Amino acid sequence: MTETTKTAKGISRRSLLKTASAAAGRAAGSGVVTGFPTIWAQNPITLRQFGTGVSNLNAIAEKCKADLGITLEMTATDSDAAAQRAVTQPKSYDIADIEYWILKKVYPTGVIQPMDVKKLKYYDKVVPLFKNGKLKPDSVIAQGTAPHTVGYFESADAKTFAKQPTDWMTMVPTIYNADTLGIRPDLVGRDITTWADIMDPAFKGKTSILNIPSIGIMDAAMIMEAMGNIKYADKGNMTKEEIDKTIDFLIKAKQDGQFRAFWKSFDESVNLMASGEVVIQSMWSPAVTAVRSKGIACKFQPLKEGYRSWGGGLGLSSGLKGVALD
């Protein structure tokens, strides 16, 4: 497992994304949990947090220290390493800053404890997406592990997810966004309108998708369905036959040389696009911004099939107790 401790960079990268609860923001440093500032001042507390580089930013730790007097030690990993650490090293952290799709892997192991919503001051400000799966009343609920499907437990000691909101939340939601294809409009030479465009022979050897298996296979599913190769009942809960077809598709596309590379980190995606080695790839919106900041044309391209969405939040270690838990 590869980890890197964050150095001071200020707010950047995917911190440009939407906050999941309007005033809630981060659980620490924003008043989400309240009523204990005097205790904290008398008993200095250090909390260990790990998660992806998306949101483990030194500026957040600095704000937490300034507002609450709590020292927040942050360690950044990639998504796969975050899931592995959450399960296999539960004594190494107090706060797990992870994505919702990881919860199905993590919660059954008992390493994260349910969170009493009555202790969350701004719980009523959490956007509906994390409570019922809809941004607006007429929104269509997404396929896959939508945050609300793993957002609650029936009780404080339950090991299964609740179908409706309860008093016990799995995590405080913090950020969410929807990803699509990033393109070099100066190099693609035509309009890009569908996920299927990434398989255009004209782009052979100049495309890329994400090399995090649980997310990259969703890229492949969006592409395959857009091409008319398959119609998934639920892309986030594939049958064995659907998985086999999707993997076979990826293997053939790679063997045919369609992909220049598979990227795993923010910087990799930026470098591939900025260098011109890749002209169309699955991409995060702040990575597009990073390419533009270099004076290079890059576009976060809307597609007719829609976006691949995601969300993340803060979970509490089952080992947290007493003042540290508060």
Positions of predicted regions on the chain:
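Extracytoplasmic/periplasmic substrate-recognition and gating elements
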Residues: M283, A287, R292-D326
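Hydrophobic residues within well-ordered alpha-helices
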Residues: A86-V87, N271-G276, L316
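Extracytoplasmic ligand-binding site segments that recognize negatively charged/polar headgroups
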Residues: S55, Y107, I112-E268
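Early extracytoplasmic/lumenal segment of secretory-pathway proteins
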Residues: Q42-T109, V270
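Short beta-strand-to-loop elements that line the ligand-binding cleft
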Residues: L72-D78, D97, G257-S265, Q301
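Paired acidic/hydrophobic, glycine-rich loop segments that form the ligand-binding mouth/hinge
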Residues: Y93-I98, F262, V279-W284
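N-terminal export leaders
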Residues: S12-V32
